């Protein structure tokens, strides 16, 4: 999964040559857990922000035609906002993205029942989807990896499922999202990112 946001020439020269990953407070969960925001900057001055709550892509800042950094991804300014609003801004969706009709399916001859949360169907794995969970974060050079252990039966899905979502900001101005998962049983794994883009930028 790769998002390419390229400019022919970069005008933000004061950050040129600097690559960094910074961590800061981003609020607390309803359980009182501390939420962190990770800001990744490449050598061209492009900025990507992600959070360990929901492994969410919060913002992507690129220079506009006047060289002013502009956010082209819709998101919130505080971690608490992601817990009370439901447009799924930037969220990591899983185990399953989209709808499962009647909130049930058959796997290996067994009926699997999920929680209905939209007109009798299961949308984005229900009210306890990956986007509402805290993820373990590991910072790397120009990247942040988020890990989650989804135990057997979580959201109703079978199998212990260990998943990693890695966000990378490259020096050719690409945001890359890499998914990796392993389960000890046959299960459903249909993950995605739910970002909304406004390429004109927003405040």
Features from the language model and the residues they span:
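Surface-exposed acidic/polar loop and edge beta-strand patches at domain peripheries
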Residues: 15-203
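Extreme N-terminal basic, low-complexity initiation segments
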Residues: 2-7
């Amino acid at each position: 999964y790769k998002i390419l946001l390229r400019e022919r020439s970069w005008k933000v020269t004061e950050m040129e040559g600097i690559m960094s990953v910074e961590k800061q407070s981003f609020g607390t969960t309803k359980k009182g857990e501390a939420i962190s925001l990770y800001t990744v900057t490449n050598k061209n001055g492009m900025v990507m922000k992600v959070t360990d709550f929901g492994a969410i892509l919060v913002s992507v800042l690129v220079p506009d035609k006047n060289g002013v950094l502009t956010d082209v991804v819709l998101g919130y300014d505080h971690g608490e906002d992601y817990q009370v609003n439901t447009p799924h801004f930037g969220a990591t969706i899983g185990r399953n993205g989209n709808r499962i009709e009647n909130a049930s399916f058959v796997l290996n001859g067994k009926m699997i029942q999920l929680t209905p949360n939209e007109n009798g169907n299961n949308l984005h794995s229900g009210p306890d989807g990956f986007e509402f969970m805290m993820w373990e974060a590991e910072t790397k050079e120009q990247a942040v990896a988020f890990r989650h252990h989804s135990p057997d039966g979580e959201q109703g899905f079978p199998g212990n499922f260990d998943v990693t979502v890695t966000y990378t900001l490259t020096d050719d101005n690409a945001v890359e999202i890499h998914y990796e998962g392993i389960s000890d049983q046959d299960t459903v794994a249909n993950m995605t990112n739910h970002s909304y883009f406004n390429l004109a930028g927003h405040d």
